């Protein structure tokens, strides 16, 4: 736990004019809302065909709701309590009250004055409220089109990756531990760089992967600022016991980020972990509602496996069939606890989602994918870049964990002294352009 009396640094916020948080709230969030409105409008004929006049009226009401929301955001209006009586409504409204208690000089919680992490998460929850409040549309995913497009536009890279995976599986029994480690490290890096494909950062523009992911790795190595991959490997090897005896049933939890190509890289890594015996069980954690434009929902997860099974490519199809089998037999499982779509820092989990924390404590390794998970791990705060990753977690230590993240927000810890300054000179946007990455590991058993 963090030292008693030590206050964490300030939250990143749009109140710091000119900051990345400010530019995101001012420019990118309204753009995303506009795209959601456009998506609803383009689907109005489908709503009418499926639900008749009720669908048409629901679409109009949702668009009106979202247009008001965009105005509230752009004019820095106070944040409003949710009114949709969903499973998480009370948790959201209680969190708003907590934020209000932190405001100074009688100010109200608002878009440009409150923590960026909170208001950005809140925007996506309000989009969901617009759908919840108009029942025929409550299951509509306004981001589905972009996610499926990302998958299809990355077909060539997916073919390369599935072919590579199937070759590995064919030769698995003859692999030495050195070869196994080498291929594990490659697939960790593929999963890491798969995170570059983030539609919320590009505000929904094409951000697909078209090159061979494996061939790209040597050129990308120098952009990894912290690489704790070897510690991840050591943790897995220690947790599974002897490879031949298979005495321990190691479980890996993967906290997913983006659908499309990135999800495929995660599935390939998970397949390798099972097929190699490095893990006996994989638990995937996704989002229960459409989230941050490209995040994985249960529908995206199932759709991706189904599409890969149906591919007109031998090794893609073989991979999809195997993944379906893993799900059916329970080797893989998908979970979407509501905490993942709350605005909380992960250090709040012990109190605000104790059941989820208890579940994660039984894991042998937790992989946190992507930028938003990193922001929640570190509290999205103005940490010094040299602060240890363990310290920035502020006591969140359910099990050995690793963040696989390409940098898309101006929070980064665990760097050597002088490294951030050197990067700022070479590339002023190094924290936000998705060009750099980290593989950062922390364990409750690790010596500090």
Swiss-Prot record:
S-adenosyl-L-methionine binds at residues 262, 295. Mn(2+) binds at residues 257-258, 295. It comes from the Eukaryota. Substrate binds at residues 257-258, 371-375, 408. One of its GO terms (molecular function) is S-adenosylmethionine-dependent methyltransferase activity. Metal-dependent phosphatase that shows phosphatase activity against several substrates, including fructose-1-phosphate and fructose-6-phosphate. Its preference for fructose-1-phosphate, a strong glycating agent that causes DNA damage rather than a canonical yeast metabolite, suggests a damage-control function in hexose phosphate metabolism. Has also been shown to have O-methyltransferase activity that methylates glutamate residues of target proteins to form gamma-glutamyl methyl ester residues. Possibly methylates PCNA, suggesting it is involved in the DNA damage response. This is Damage-control phosphatase ARMT1. The gene is armt1.
